[in-house]
């Protein structure tokens, strides 16, 4: 049986890691042992922050809706309750977009929510 030399696969693996580490400062982009640590840490941060991004955007949308609905005298929680009772099924992303870009349409939504709460 022939001897298997692993130079090709090792070189390819090192090249892959160093390509991912491109743009890092100092030895982090040139030295494999340092680069692999930095790349693994960066991938962990990326994984964590993809999940955090969803939470952050939801919180931002809620703040925008709250600000918009309070401008017309209705707090966020009562506004959302009124929308649900009125049968208006818009998600928070769309509601926040309407609150910013189309205040007149948002005002009519607030009025419908208030009417449904009565």
From Swiss-Prot:
It comes from Paramagnetospirillum magneticum (strain ATCC 700264 / AMB-1). SUPFAM superfamilies: Ribosomal protein L20. Keywords: Ribonucleoprotein, Ribosomal protein, RNA-binding, rRNA-binding. PROSITE patterns: RIBOSOMAL_L20. Belongs to the bacterial ribosomal protein bL20 family. One of its GO terms (molecular function) is structural constituent of ribosome. It holds the Pfam family Ribosomal_L20. GO terms for biological process: ribosomal large subunit assembly; translation. The keyword Flavoprotein does not apply. PANTHER family: 39S RIBOSOMAL PROTEIN L20. HAMAP family: Ribosomal_bL20. Binds directly to 23S ribosomal RNA and is necessary for the in vitro assembly process of the 50S ribosomal subunit. It is not involved in the protein synthesizing functions of that subunit. GO terms for cellular component: ribonucleoprotein complex; ribosome. This is Large ribosomal subunit protein bL20. InterPro entries: Ribosomal_bL20, RIBOSOMAL_L20_CS, Ribosomal_protein_bL20_C. CDD domains: Ribosomal_L20.
